Amino acid sequence: MPTDVEPVTIPDFLKWKSDRRRIAVLTAYDFPTARLLDASGVDCILVGDSLGTVVQGWETTLRVTIDQVIYHAEMVARASRRALVVADLPFLSYQVSPRQALKSAGRVLKETNCQAVKLEGGRKMAATIRAVVDADIPVMGHVGLRPQAIRRLGAYKVQRSTDEIMDDAQAVAESGAFAVVLECIPREMAAKITAQLTIPTIGIGAGPHCDGQVLVYHDMLGITEGHRPKFVRQYADLGQQIKAAVAGYVADVGEGRFPGETESFR
């Protein structure tokens, strides 16, 4: 991989907002995936607590631990040469107090070499975001649908409380976050928030007017089985391709066709 590429920085995000240059974000959880995404021009790689659902197989993100995030984020940060790497702070690693959040965020940056952390919440998390940012740790916010609040919400659904969500996004920006994820909100609301804020908005299920977009890697490549959210555009069907390839291998082994002459030593 080339070593002379210019890495994406936090100031780049803010400049791209003013330049109206869209920001492409994808998730990754391991070295080879991050290396592929980085080489493909992704601006930012998010090591999301979504690893709980798409990697570990749980129904929610709530079981993910900070040690697990650190384990995955270290691999991703080591693979990335250009893309900004952001790691999620998982459930109950920051909600107790700003002090707890600072300790967790510090661990993540120090032990993974990623560039920033992401945490969920708006006005109620303003003091927490400020405490982390004041320690020179960049923070990406997350408002709208908050997966870590699934037990209270009851279901993953579009959030329509306009005033509340707009106030949350504004609070995140005023607390010093460098960007904010808008998840599962009406496109008109996302457009208003994007126009109102001086920091980039990164949409997931928030329409086309955000400053950037994020998707889960496994969803957009067709690896995840089962229900696909409305906001996901599937760019490949790797799940079926993997099944076909493995079935071919199993058949070749069973029939004695593998290994053949070209795969054998003399």
Go through each PLM region and give its residues.
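Alpha/beta enzyme core
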Residues: 2-230, 236-266
